[in-house]
Amino acid sequence: MKTNLFCYSATGNSLIVAKDIAAMLPETQIFSIPKIIDQDIDLNADNIGFIFPVYFSGMPRIVIDFINKLELSIDKYIFAVCTCGSLPMGTLLQVQKQLSTKGITLNAGFSIPMPGSYIIKY
């Protein structure tokens, strides 16, 4: 089964997670959201994953814009993985709501705690 991972990573934490997932799944490609957001997107995969950091208890704007641009079909397995310094808060619920506006279901959502990168906090 082919898997496409769409990743947004500012500090590298989410990219590491994407690479780890890709290493465990056969036929997996990682796409950088900033590099492909203005291109035609290859959705010819059985599984679609979104991997991104939590920004201020939610999704980064670029990920929201990217999901809004996609024309997903309901026969795909859709999952999201968010990386966070502490808690994901309502981020995965936000992903679910964003996809539901397109008639798509989020099949699974995961959060992975990572080292914090919010400099003001430290």
Protein language model features and the residues they cover:
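FMN-binding flavodoxin-like domain, especially the glycine-rich phosphate-binding loop
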Residues: M1-L5, A10-Y122
